């Protein structure tokens, strides 16, 4: 069943699902498979994935370190918008997919592949995110989505296929099949198993990046974050690369019990799903960036950003990173960050990120006007009388017309 496909680039992790897919592609499509593994900060040794692919005769294997590109070109632009999906989710999975799709298409072009493939299920958002990216970057690309084609429709069938072809089935330290997890430098997500009941509290042993707030230190940690045009550039006055900065924030946040999130979200494909997330560094970054904006952004610009943020977040969540509307919003967001420069001091304590200071050469905060003390005439309080009456005019007119003049 080649269908004119001689070569396919598979987004390959070395895990159970994509290892099964690799073998299935070889058997069903009788084509050459190019294995591509993206290092986005999974904190895993990726060379075993190479060995697994080689075991199945794969000749072209790409293991690419994309951590800096991921944070610089995807995570940081997203955080300039203070992006949260449905008010809480930091989009750690969503924002990784366009970069993987981009690199897959680049490899397909370089190797002469006619198709790309991924391991996303037919029930989830990732199939949409991957494939919208593929088609935006190469309209004629062929897409193979095994979960929408094969008859391996249950875990038991997957395990039987794996056993038949000598593919090891991973287990946790209890000897059980682990949660469905996705990890990168921004977050780790957990789905499936007991979490499919939204009433069940997650097992503490499940968490990877953070201690529980109850077990976090009793002493607060103070951190200073430096921003330049909306992007984090230094921690405690030490400049680092984007990926190194986020990794450092993950360490600081994780040890202080920061960044855990348990939510039921609305998937693009129409169903609700329950996920548990750890985003320690991203949580700190989001709080600090908003604090920096509070000092440096014009009021109406800040409010407009807040109005547009849910739309921007939905575009990323649904897979429209490469769409013209996301690019348009990004241009506006980036323009708003010109003066978002300075420092924010935060206190990290038992799951909380508390802003305790902010300063900027571009500050719009004028203490001479805002003071409760004598402002030496900088602000004439009597001017407020006309301001209030003009703003009340429409409501006064409506009240008079509806209620009639008093006799």
From Swiss-Prot:
Listed GO MF terms: argininosuccinate synthase activity; ATP binding
Binding of L-aspartate, residues: 121, 125-126
The protein's annotated pathway: Amino-acid biosynthesis; L-arginine biosynthesis; L-arginine from L-ornithine and carbamoyl phosphate: step 2/3
Statement: the UniProt record of this protein carries the keyword Plastid: no
Catalyzed reactions per annotation: L-citrulline + L-aspartate + ATP = 2-(N(omega)-L-arginino)succinate + AMP + diphosphate + H(+)
Gene Ontology CC: cytoplasm
EC number: 6.3.4.5
Enzyme's top EC category: ligase
Residues reported to bind ATP: 11-19, 38, 119
InterPro entries in alphabetical order: Arginosuc_syn_C, Arginosuc_syn_N, Arginosuc_synth, Arginosuc_synth_CS, Arginosuc_synth_type_1_subfam, AS_cat/multimer_dom_body, Rossmann-like_a/b/a_fold
Chief subcellular location: cytoplasm
Gene Ontology biological-process entries: argininosuccinate metabolic process; L-arginine biosynthetic process; urea cycle
CDD domains assigned to the protein according to its UniProt record, in alphabetical order: ASS (cd01999)
Presence of keyword ATP-binding: yes
Quaternary structure and interacting proteins, as annotated: Homotetramer.
HAMAP family in the cross-refs: Arg_succ_synth_type1 (MF_00005)
Protein name: Argininosuccinate synthase
Species this chain originates from: Magnetococcus marinus (strain ATCC BAA-1437 / JCM 17883 / MC-1)
């Amino acid at each position: 069943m080649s269908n004119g496909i001689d070569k396919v680039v598979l987004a390959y992790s070395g895990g159970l699902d994509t290892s099964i897919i690799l073998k299935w592609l070889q058997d069903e499509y009788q084509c050459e498979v190019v294995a591509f593994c993206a290092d986005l900060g999974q904190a895993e040794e990726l060379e075993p994935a190479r060995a697994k692919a080689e075991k199945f005769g794969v000749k072209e294997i790409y293991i690419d370190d994309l951590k800096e590109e991921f944070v610089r070109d995807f995570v940081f632009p997203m955080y300039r918008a203070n992006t949260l999906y449905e008010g809480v989710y930091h989009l750690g999975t969503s924002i990784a997919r366009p970069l993987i799709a981009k690199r897959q298409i680049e490899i397909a072009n370089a190797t002469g592949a006619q198709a790309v493939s991924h391991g996303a299920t037919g029930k989830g958002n990732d199939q949409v995110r991957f494939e919208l990216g593929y088609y935006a970057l190469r309209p004629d690309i062929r897409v193979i989505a095994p979960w929408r084609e094969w008859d391996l429709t249950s875990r038991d069938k997957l395990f039987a296929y794996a056993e038949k072809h000598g593919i090891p089935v991973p287990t946790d330290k209890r000897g059980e099949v682990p949660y469905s997890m996705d990890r990168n430098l921004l977050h780790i997500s957990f789905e499936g198993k007991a979490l499919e009941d939204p009433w069940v509290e997650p097992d503490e042993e499940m968490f990877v990046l953070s201690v529980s707030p109850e077990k976090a230190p009793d002493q607060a940690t103070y951190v200073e974050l430096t921003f330049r045009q909306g992007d984090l550039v230094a921690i405690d006055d030490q400049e680092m690369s984007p990926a190194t900065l986020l990794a450092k924030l993950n360490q600081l946040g994780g040890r202080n019990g920061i960044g855990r999130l348990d939510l039921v979200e609305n998937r693009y494909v129409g169903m609700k799903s329950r996920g548990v997330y750890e985003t320690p560094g991203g949580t700190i970054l989001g709080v600090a960036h908003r604090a920096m904006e509070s000092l440096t952004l014009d009021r109406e610009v800040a409010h407009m950003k807040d109005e547009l943020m849910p739309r921007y977040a939905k575009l990323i969540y649904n897979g429209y990173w490469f769409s013209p509307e996301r690019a348009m919003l990004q241009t506006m967001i980036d323009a708003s960050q010109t003066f978002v420069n300075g420092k924010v001091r935060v206190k990290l304590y038992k799951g909380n990120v508390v802003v305790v200071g902010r300063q900027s050469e571009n500050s719009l905060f004028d203490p001479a006007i805002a003071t409760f003390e004598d402002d030496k005439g900088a602000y004439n309080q009597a001017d407020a009388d006309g301001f209030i009456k003009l703003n009340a005019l429409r409501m006064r007119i409506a009240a008079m017309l509806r209620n009639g003049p008093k006799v």
